[in-house]
A protein has these predicted regions:
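N-terminal beta1-alpha1 cap of cysteine-dependent amidohydrolase-like domains
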Residues: 1-94
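Glycine-rich nucleotide phosphate-binding loop and flanking beta-alpha elements
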Residues: 11-12, 51, 102-103, 132-134
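Short, glycine/charged-enriched secondary-structure capping and boundary segments
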Residues: 18-20, 57-60, 109-112, 140-143
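Short amphipathic alpha-helical segments and helix-helix/interface helices
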Residues: 33, 63, 113-119
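Short, surface-exposed, charge-dense and proline/glycine-enriched linear segments
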Residues: 68-76, 102-114
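Short, basic, glycine/proline-bearing loop/turn elements
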Residues: 94-103
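Class I SAM-dependent methyltransferase SAM-binding "motif I" and its flanking Rossmann-like core
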Residues: 104-108, 114-149
Length: 149
């Protein structure tokens, strides 16, 4: 697995709706191009498994940003609370771990046994914000909500 752990995957703009442009700073996009598989199959793993509409918007916007940057996906799946059965990464080339509330995402990652599934994953892992933090072995997340301390 090749992992990119970032604070963000792009520059965010708010017009009528959120728009993301992939960052090119520090050769991020060019490094991705060097390892990108044509016809990649992507999976967006959400931070909040219950926020279906927000998850759909984030998935769609991130995958649009990749397409605009010349990094197209053949398939664009999502993993959130609508997922039925076990997580299956056998036909996935690129995983995007979304950003959001770190403890909520951490619980979801535990529920779907993401760490165990990633041990055999041989593709590209792109993590942003909370997704990057939850990729660490030991993480200190400043409490945001009552009862998190």
């Amino acid at each position: 697995m090749i992992a990119f752990l970032t604070s963000t995957l792009g520059d965010f703009y708010l017009m009528d709706e959120m728009v993301v442009d992939l960052i090119s700073k520090n050769d991020f996009t060019s490094n991705l191009r060097q390892i990108w598989k044509r016809g990649s199959k992507g999976l967006f793993i959400s931070a909040d498994p219950a926020d279906f509409s927000g998850n759909d918007r984030m998935r769609d916007e991130f995958f649009r940003a990749f397409r605009v940057a010349g990094l197209a996906f053949e398939r664009r799946d999502i993993c959130d609370g609508r997922m039925k059965g076990e997580l299956d990464l056998s036909d996935v080339d690129v995983i995007i771990l979304g950003g959001g509330h770190v403890p909520t995402q951490h619980k979801f990652f535990k529920k779907i046994a993401l760490k165990e599934h990633l041990s055999a994953f041989d593709g590209i892992l792109l993590a942003l914000s909370a997704g990057s933090m939850n990729s660490g072995e030991t993480v200190y997340s400043i409490p945001e909500l009552e009862g998190e301390a």
